[in-house]
Structures are given as structure tokens and as C-alpha cells.
């Protein structure tokens, strides 16, 4: 690295393997990261480390079959989650780092936020403080396929639709990726895909990189004029290359990072004919339950989640034809919407009454219940700076009700030796509430079902045996 007194911008490619799909209630197993310069040349040593699972948690069997990481391996190679979080935090908070991965905005970043939340680090600052940012290559690949597909091979899945699974893309483009779902292998594969797009479609790549920033995206969005844009998102469906023309109707009434978009390729008649209550109900009805009713062609775009938005003409006529997007239909819908501005009030009303948010009484699931105050954040910093053995004597008051529970869990999971007798009893009671007879019976049945399903697969059977032994040991 050139040391000219100025900090160099770097990319930090990373990937988690986890013991389950829920970012708040499941736990990390393995983390891998590689830092590169702006041209994707590796700098520094690759980082791979494991997280020791705490004794109030059992992994999801299906997840272990995918990753091949058993809780025994994570326990043998890993450190407690407090130490695991500290290492990730120090990598993520190097100034001028762009933290990225593959599907990280929806998955890995949520895991990071929850790991930091459980371990007394700021869940969000890593992605913006000190000139830091985040980005996600999954949507870059989707955008490349839809908007500038030349020069890259695009694999199809069994349904004949484009596949954006990392292992399919690497194979189709002759990139080494032998050990898919090993965190390090996935990181190298992601770097290779980034290089591929940067070489084959440099203008698109640079555009998307610049527009990962919400202020750049805001400049594209013109609500008063309903200026149409092209949008690429997995929510739009692979059958049309995850792409459509959209128009911004209004900003979300409560979340200033969300804009309400109408999908111009959809059927807009519900927006004209139905009232906001009916629209809201239909919007939150699963597609399979809609019957003959037309879906509501409205979607939120969160400008702080690196969405792909570009000028409408970025989608060329030949690509719209290839993706089966009817340009005239979209233009007709745009004209109708502009003639019916009352639709704006309707969609704002849909989102003014938020979708039903069921609060959980489990503190692990309460990250999004609210931000911590400055005073509480300062107190949490003191927790981190205190030697674990001195935590019991820490005389500190918190305003937010979550923190006392978080601190107890933090001590019990990471430093059980610091619990006194009464606290040990409290933790035992917590574990009893987690490992109920019903839960354990369901867990055993799931392992048995998978063991029958994969009876001929020695490796999978061995993983399931290890899980069974682990459960018997810790419960």
C-alpha cells in the first residue's frame, strides 16, 4: 500500500456462514474477509475465524448440512461471540472501507447488525462513519444481466430463468469456486465476479459503485414529476430479469429513506379503483392467496440499501424486448398516473399505518425497537472497556430497558464465570425456557427426518450425528 499520508480507499469483501437463516435468533459459525485496493488486488492477509456457540442455542440442522460447519468444529476453532464481534468490528471500522459481499444487504449485514447489537457495538456506524460505505454485488450482477449483458456468460436454473447463485455464475464464467459455502471460497468468488464486471462493463460498474450512495440516488428521484426510472431488484422476479420501469409516487410518510414506487409494468387499475384500506390489505396478502385479484403494483425502494436505480433510457429497447417488458404499456400507465395525482394520497395512506409489527419479548430480537440514546451509548462503551471479570461490580444505569437484559445475556454467554449463584439460576431458567420438551422433540424429529432423507449420503449423516451428540451434550 502506498503510504502518502492519505488513507487509501479499500474494499472489504466478506461472508458469514451461519447456524441458521434468522439474523437475530440464529448465530454465526464462520466469518471470512479479504481486503483489496480499488482495483481488487488483495492487500493484507485473508481473515477467517469461527464463533463458539453459546449454551442456550442449537443450530438449525438444514443450515449445518449446507455449510458443513458443526457446532463442535466452531467450538474447537472459535472464540466466544464477544471476541468474534470485536475482530469483525476492527476490520469494518478501518476508515474509507467499502464493506461488500454477495447478498449481504439482505443477509450478512443483518447478521453484522445483530452481532454488534448483542455485543455492545454500534449496529450501524460501521457502514457510514469515517467515509465508510457498503455495497452488494448480487444486485450488480442482476443489473449487468438486465442492462449490459455483453461479455459475461449468464447461466440458467432448472426453470430456464437466469440464475444469480454465486456458484452458478462462477462455473459459467470459468472461475475457480470448488468449495461453495465455505466462507473463504465464497469471498474469493465474489472478488472474481467484481473483477469480471469491472473489466467487461466498466461504465455500468462505475455507475453502480457511485450510486451505492443514498445522496446520489436521491438526485435521481423526482416525485413531483413522477420521473420514470429503471429499477433492478430480486423482488421484481427473475422471469423479467428482476427489472422494470418504475415511477416515484411519494416519499414514505415515516421512513425518510424509503420512496414509494409504482411498477409501471403492472396492472395499475387497483390504484385507481380501490381505497387505501383495501389496497393495504391486498398489498400484504401473499400472491398465492390473491385469487383473481390483481396484485398492487407498488413497492418501497430503500435508498440506504444500495438499490439499483438509473435513468429510464438505461434500459435499451432491445433489452426490454429480451426481458419481455412492454415499453408502451409502461408509458401508458405513466400517463394515467400523471393524470390522477390523487393516487399519491392513497399510497401514502397505505404506508402511514405501518404493516403490523409484532414486538418480540426476546431481547435478541429487539434491535429494531429503536435507537439507543447518546447516554446509553456512552454507558455501553464503558461495558466494552471493562475487563469481563469486573463486569459484576460495574455500577451503571441504563435508560433503555433492553440493555440490562443484553448485558446479562452477554455475560452469561461469553463470560459465564462472572455469574454469581443467583445469576446462574436465572440463566438456567432461561435455558429451560429455550429448550422446552416440545422444542427438543421437534428438533429430534427434524434430525431424524433429514437422516432418512439423506440416508445414502455419508457426509450428511455424519453431520446430523454430530448435531445429535451436540444437543445431547449441552441440553
Residues covered by each model-derived region:
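Long, charge-rich C-terminal accessory regions
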Residues: 253-430
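Acidic catalytic cores of enzymes that act on phosphate-bearing nucleotides/polynucleotides
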Residues: 210-290
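Metal-dependent phosphoesterase core characteristic of DEDDh/y 3'-5' exonuclease domains
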Residues: 26-31, 35-36, 41-69, 90-202, ...
Amino acid at each position: 500500500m502506498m503510504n502518502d499520508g492519505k488513507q487509501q480507499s479499500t474494499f472489504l469483501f466478506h461472508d458469514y456462514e451461519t447456524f441458521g437463516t434468522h439474523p437475530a435468533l440464529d448465530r454465526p459459525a464462520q466469518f471470512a474477509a479479504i481486503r483489496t485496493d480499488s482495483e481488487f488486488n488483495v492487500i493484507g492477509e485473508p481473515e477467517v475465524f469461527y464463533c463458539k456457540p453459546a449454551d442456550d442455542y442449537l443450530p438449525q440442522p438444514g443450515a449445518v448440512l449446507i455449510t458443513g460447519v458443526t457446532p463442535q468444529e466452531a467450538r474447537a476453532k472459535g472464540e466466544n461471540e464477544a471476541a468474534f464481534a470485536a475482530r469483525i468490528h476492527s476490520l469494518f471500522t478501518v476508515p474509507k472501507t467499502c464493506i461488500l459481499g454477495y447478498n449481504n444487504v439482505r443477509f450478512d449485514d443483518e447478521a453484522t447488525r445483530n452481532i454488534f447489537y448483542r455485543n455492545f457495538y454500534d449496529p450501524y456506524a460501521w457502514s457510514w462513519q469515517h467515509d465508510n460505505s457498503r455495497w452488494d454485488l448480487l444486485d450488480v450482477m442482476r443489473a449487468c444481466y438486465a442492462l449490459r449483458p455483453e461479455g459475461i456468460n449468464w447461466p440458467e436454473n432448472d426453470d430456464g430463468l437466469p440464475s444469480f447463485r454465486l456458484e452458478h455464475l462462477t462455473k459459467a464464467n470459468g472461475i475457480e469456486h470448488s468449495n461453495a459455502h465455505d466462507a473463504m471460497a465464497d469471498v474469493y468468488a465474489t472478488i472474481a465476479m467484481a473483477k469480471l464486471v469491472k473489466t467487461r462493463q466498466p461504465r455500468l460498474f462505475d455507475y453502480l459503485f457511485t450510486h451505492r450512495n443514498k445522496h446520489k440516488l436521491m438526485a435521481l428521484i423526482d416525485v413531483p414529476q413522477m420521473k420514470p426510472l429503471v429499477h433492478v431488484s430480486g423482488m421484481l422476479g427473475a422471469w423479467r430479469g428482476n427489472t422494470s420501469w418504475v415511477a416515484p409516487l411519494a416519499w414514505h410518510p415515516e421512513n425518510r429513506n424509503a420512496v414509494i414506487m409504482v411498477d409501471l409494468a403492472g396492472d395499475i387499475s387497483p390504484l385507481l379503483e380501490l381505497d387505501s384500506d383495501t389496497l393495504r390489505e391486498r398489498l400484504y396478502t401473499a400472491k398465492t392467496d390473491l385469487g383473481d385479484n390483481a396484485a398492487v403494483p407498488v413497492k418501497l425502494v430503500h435508498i440506504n440499501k444500495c438499490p439499483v436505480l438509473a435513468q429510464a433510457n438505461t434500459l435499451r429497447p432491445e433489452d426490454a424486448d429480451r426481458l419481455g417488458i412492454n415499453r408502451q404499456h409502461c408509458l401508458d400507465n405513466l400517463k394515467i398516473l400523471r393524470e390522477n395525482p390523487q393516487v399519491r394520497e392513497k399510497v401514502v395512506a397505505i404506508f402511514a399505518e405501518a404493516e403490523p409489527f409484532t414486538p418480540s419479548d426476546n431481547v435478541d430480537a429487539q434491535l429494531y425497537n429503536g435507537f439507543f440514546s447518546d447516554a446509553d451509548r456512552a454507558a455501553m462503551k464503558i461495558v466494552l472497556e471493562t475487563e469481563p471479570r469486573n463486569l459484576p461490580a460495574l455500577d451503571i444505569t441504563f435508560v433503555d430497558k433492553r440493555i440490562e437484559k443484553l448485558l446479562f445475556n452477554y455475560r452469561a454467554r461469553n463470560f459465564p464465570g462472572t455469574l454469581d449463584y443467583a445469576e446462574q439460576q436465572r440463566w438456567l431458567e432461561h435455558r429451560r425456557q429455550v429448550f422446552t420438551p416440545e422444542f427438543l422433540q421437534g428438533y429430534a424429529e427434524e434430525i431424524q427426518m433429514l437422516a432418512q432423507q439423506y440416508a445414502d449420503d455419508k457426509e450428511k449423516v455424519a453431520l446430523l450425528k454430530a448435531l445429535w451428540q451436540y444437543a445431547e451434550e449441552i441440553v
